[in-house]
């Protein structure tokens, strides 16, 4: 009985560690997305999207290739771009993640 409880506790800890690792990966993707915008690095920005992603941003609707072109084109005329990440709230449910990433952008035109 005691061994079973230890095993269950270990499984719970492993699940929590894997969820934490998944959340950190999402935070890294968010950071790389902002870095790609700030450095005008389309390759880095593109790397955060799945190939079959659909981007719905109001002013752009479509796939990641077009979205990256849209962003890089819009930002290249600026003197500087600085995106700062704020609170990041992520919930993991089975094989899906849901959440919000807040950011502040300072753009020098």
Label for each model-derived stretch:
Residues 41-105:
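A solvent-exposed, acidic/Ser-Thr-rich amphipathic alpha-helical stretch
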Residues 1-35, 39, 47:
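Short, low-complexity N-terminal intrinsically disordered segments enriched in polar/charged residues
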Residues 107-109:
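Conserved small/polar residues in nucleotide/adenosyl-binding loops
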């Amino acid at each position: 009985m005691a061994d079973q409880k230890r095993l269950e506790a270990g499984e719970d800890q492993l699940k929590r560690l894997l969820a934490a690792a998944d959340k950190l990966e999402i935070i890294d993707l968010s950071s790389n997305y902002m870095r790609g915008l700030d450095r005008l690095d389309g390759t880095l920005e593109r790397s955060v999207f799945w190939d079959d992603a659909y981007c719905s941003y109001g002013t752009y609707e479509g796939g990641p290739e077009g979205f990256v072109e849209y962003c890089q084109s819009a930002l290249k005329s600026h003197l500087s771009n600085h995106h700062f990440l704020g609170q990041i709230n992520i919930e993991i449910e089975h094989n899906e993640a849901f959440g919000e990433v807040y950011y502040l952008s300072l753009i020098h035109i």
